[in-house]
Amino acid sequence: MFSSQHRLLYQPSGPDLSKNLDPERGRRLGIDVGSVRIGVAFSDPDGILATPVETVRRYRSAKHLRRLAELVVELQVVEVVVGLPWTLTDRTGSSAKDAIDTAEALARRVAPVPVRLVDERLTTVSAQRLLRAAGVRAKDQRAVIDQAAAVVILQNWLDQCRAATPARADEPTTGSVAGEVIDG
């Protein structure tokens, strides 16, 4: 089901840096696979912030896969993160199969860039809340909800990677406790 031949990796509980599977510095691409549209987001080269890129329309042909592969090249992506929609009861359905099939097809096109499947539970709900908080009316959300969901998927992954990566000795730190006020 999950092929390693094309560097398709399934990581249900976040990054496993012990196996050194994570690429170095560079942009990441986040993908929210839907039945009609695919939301796309990308990160800055340092992997700190996810930003929406575009919504790619799905086609019966491979036209959408071609566009996703083009984005990997255009944006010089070092890793692709595809949301895998699990249910709250840890089950998968047709949406998950669709995400897996899309990720496998994309992995074949962009090898050796790794394509990872990551848990995307409740990302659309989170994206809707973020858009509502930003003042986007419900009727206007449809045009950007897929991109917003891709941002949530990618940002969650970036945050997990940062949390799993020990601080390097050459990185400057404040030496302060989180939440502590620092005088300039």
Swiss-Prot record:
Q: Does the keyword Cytoplasm apply?
A: yes
Output the InterPro entries linked to this UniProt entry.
RNaseH-like_sf, YqgF, YqgF/RNaseH-like_dom, YqgF/RNaseH-like_dom_sf
Q: For this UniProt record, give its keywords in alphabetical order, as a comma-separated list.
A: Cytoplasm, Hydrolase, Nuclease, Ribosome biogenesis
Top EC class, one word: hydrolase
Q: Where is this region: Disordered?
A: 1-23
Top-level division of the source organism's lineage: Bacteria
Q: Which GO terms describe its cellular component?
A: cytosol
- Enumerate the GO terms in the molecular function aspect: nuclease activity
**Which is a GO BP term held by this UniProt record?**
rRNA 5'-end processing
Query: What does the record give as EC number?
Result: 3.1.-.-
Q: Does the keyword Nucleotide-binding apply?
A: no
Q: Where in the cell is it found?
A: Cytoplasm
Signal sequence span per UniProt?
Answer: none
UniProt lists the family membership as follows: Belongs to the YqgF nuclease family.
State what this protein does: Could be a nuclease involved in processing of the 5'-end of pre-16S rRNA.
**Listed name of the protein:** Putative pre-16S rRNA nuclease
Q: Give the organism's phylogenetic lineage.
A: Bacteria, Bacillati, Actinomycetota, Actinomycetes, Mycobacteriales
